[in-house]
Structure formats: C-alpha cells, structure tokens
C-alpha cells in the first residue's frame, strides 16, 4: 500500500493539518476586533464540512488488495559509499585541523621583569 506512514494513510495527516491550521486561525482571529472575530464560526464550520466530506467519501477501499512479494533493491549503493568516504575525509581533515590549531598551539613563556 503506497503512501502509508506509521500505518496510516495521507488522509489522516491531511485532517491533522487542516485542524492545526483551523485552530491556529481561530487563535489569531480571536484577537481581532469587530466582525472579523465572528468569522471564527465560519472557519470552524468550513473545517467541519471538509472533515465530514473526507471521512464519508474515502478514495481507497477499506480492505487493501494483497501485494505480491517485494524485492528490496538498493539502487543508491555506490552513491552512499561515495558520500560516506567524502564525509569521512572531511571529518578526518577537521580533526587534523583541530589538532594542529588548537591542541598543538605553542604556549610562549611570559618574559620576566628585569630590575
């Protein structure tokens, strides 16, 4: 089943996004004055209508079709190792620069005062 994250489809995330945006808009409109404050009711009713439409008219069937055996292929195998080699070289270069500029920094003796 394509498009599933954490065992739920895209519709659940769409509904969550709609309600988060509606609640944010309601909070912002509650600070308004005049007739704009009463538009909260229309925003809430609009989100309620969209939610009922999405719940009552689903796109997919309730029972998914059985899938065939899936063969897992790593198409980015070489690229992943090139990226790993590059990041390892950058890490070792940064470690070398840290060693030369910070840990091996010379400490000069302060001159003694002569009387």
From Swiss-Prot:
The chain crosses the membrane at residues 5-25, 38-58, 81-101. It comes from the Eukaryota. GO terms for cellular component: cilium; membrane. It is found in: Membrane; Cell projection, Cilium. Disruption phenotype: Diffuse renal cyst development with tubulointerstitial nephropathy and disruption of tubular basement membranes in essentially normal-sized kidneys. Retinal lesions characterized by slow-onset loss of photoreceptors. It is a multi-pass membrane protein. The keyword Kinase does not apply. Belongs to the TMEM218 family. May be involved in ciliary biogenesis or function. Interacts with TMEM67. PANTHER family: TRANSMEMBRANE PROTEIN 218. This is Transmembrane protein 218. It comes from Mus musculus.
